[in-house]
Amino acid sequence: MQRPLLEQPERLEQRLKDIPTEPGCYLMRDADDRLLYVGKSKTLRSRVRSYFRSSHDLSPRIRLMVRQICEIEFIVTDSEAEALALESNLIKNQQPHFNVLLKDDKKYPYLCITWSEDYPRIFITRRRRFRSPLDRFYGPYVDVGLLRRTLFLVKRVFPLRQRPRPLYPNRTCLNYSIGRCPGVCQEKVSSEDYHQILRKVAMVFQGRSDELRQLLNQQMERYAERLDFESAARIRDQLQGIDQLTADQKMSLPDASVSRDVLAVAQDDHFAAIQLFQMRAGKLVGRLGFAADATDLQAGLILQRVIEEHYSQVDAVEIPPEVLVQHELPQQRLIAEWLSEQRERKVQVLHPQRRQKADLIDLVMRNAEFELGRARQSQEQQALANEDLAQLLELATPPRRIEGYDISHIQGSDAVASQVVFIDGLPAKQHYRRYKIQSSSIQAGHSDDFMAMAEIMRRRFRKWARVKAEGADLDQVRRQSSSSLNMDGLHDWPDVVMIDGGKGQLSAVMEALRELDLHEDLVVCSLAKQREEIFLPEAKQPLESEPDQLGVSLLRRLRDEAHRFAVTFHRQQRGQRMKRSRLSDIPGLGPKRVRDLLAHFQSIDAIQLASVDQLHQAPGVGLSLAKQIRAYFHPQEMDEDNMAMAGEDMA
């Protein structure tokens, strides 16, 4: 394993000399070759060298990063503007840990269109995860109610697929009959034509309603000229629907031709709330919200990072000719050049002083301050809950990392466990873990929650048992864990472990921890479901507490999240087993071919709907086997084929 460059002065100096003085991007990696940070500069060598001159001028976050740098790479570009575009793409595609400014704030929803699919789906989601580079997220939207109403009306105005999967294997459903769906499930509409419909829908969520009206008006006139009055009437209905869609956009500007985005930020020492108002043709068509880590960052830099991240993920037509910002950006001219290049037309980035534009900034800033106030209130509640939990469990300091565990199964079958983690009172989903119960004594028809929970504790903490056996100071490990939890996640020692269950589950867990010699090092409790009672090891009675206490509420949220996560995983395992067992009934399909089929088609529904030719294209499936699989799911087709062959023989 490589050592950090800071520990190798000669190698560091040589590496810095190798970096050119031209514009470009630099990439910093750690000992495991993980990308820590991507940056850009007009002069690469000077910029990279600045990280290693003096740590006093660096923020705590960047100082932590510099201590981990083991390798530095660079990519030379022709200009600083080109470096900015490259940096934006690298950050978007690789998400380096120390570049991620915007928080994954689940309260803001997005609209997703899966352009990568032959018949794209359109849905609301709070998880911004790209399954394909072609898929697009629109948002994040502040008002989820308005977003739902808009999507509901869009599905009334335009014929769109209404279901993620077909309702019937070989015929359309009622939605097709009443004109709500173009018959996607039976391919009544071509993929190209359906994409054309979706492109019109996307214009609504891009704030291009006026442009869409012009397009539809032209189509309606063409249909009328051809005397195709039925199609013209359908377009007329769509135009009326678009008028209804934009009825909620009441805020407007005096100049109806103006299109601009307006950004403002409100921040404290640790957190920033950013608002982006989208004005198109003089109307407010979208309000997007972002949350950011504001530690040691100037407001102008936060706004610049938001602009870089947001506009790197939108289509060129969504970039307006004017972007107003509350504060001067560190590289405002460069950002304007980059946006102009993206849009292929001039874009101005302005820090306005005159009244009308400054009033717009003030309006957006007030909304940002409101969001910051809500975030502070939430943080205060979380801090109070942690303090109350510390008092309940008699801890010296409020816990930062707490872990919750639960078991899920049906009479021992498909037994699984969940580990969920809250950090500073909030779910930290990157630290969640799922376990399949491995004990041979827990199987269908025989369950043992105590044994299952003990197994999970052994698997979770056996590495820490080895650390302790090697003579490590676990008190020091705890301190390191608390100081770096939110920075790099390197340490995963919990301040509190909570078990879903009563005294029995807690006793089994403590016995397992005693085997690991960690029973005195971990703070463990259990939360029983019926009376929300909290049990501690060795205590005969539950803790005295009130159900509405903040600390109890925190444990209850942790317990409910562990239960949800365990049940979801159990259902997945059970569903996969049932799929495998159903396919295993088909002659010629062994376990490997079943796995290959499911990997190729993704679901048993897709296998059931596949034609013989499509099945034949799957790995390891010959023509004869493809016919057998098709016949298994559609025996009536086989009967019809046999009857046809019999008729030919008689003839």
Swiss-Prot record:
One of its GO terms (biological process) is SOS response. InterPro entries: GIY-YIG_endonuc (IPR000305), GIY-YIG_endonuc_sf (IPR035901), GIY-YIG_UvrC_Cho (IPR047296), Hlx-hairpin-Hlx_DNA-bd_motif (IPR003583), RuvA_2-like (IPR010994), UVR_dom (IPR001943), UVR_dom_sf (IPR036876), UvrABC_protein_C (IPR050066). It is found in: Cytoplasm. One of its GO terms (molecular function) is DNA binding. Keywords: Cytoplasm, DNA damage, DNA excision, DNA repair, Excision nuclease, SOS response. Residues 210-245 form the UVR domain. Pfam families: GIY-YIG (PF01541), HHH_5 (PF14520), UVR (PF02151), UvrC_RNaseH (PF22920), UvrC_RNaseH_dom (PF08459). Residues 21-100 form the GIY-YIG domain. PROSITE patterns: GIY_YIG (PS50164), UVR (PS50151), UVRC (PS50165). GO terms for cellular component: cytoplasm; excinuclease repair complex. PANTHER family: UVRABC SYSTEM PROTEIN C, UVRC/OXIDOREDUCTASE. The UvrABC repair system catalyzes the recognition and processing of DNA lesions. UvrC both incises the 5' and 3' sides of the lesion. The N-terminal half is responsible for the 3' incision and the C-terminal half is responsible for the 5' incision. Belongs to the UvrC family. Interacts with UvrB in an incision complex. This is UvrABC system protein C.
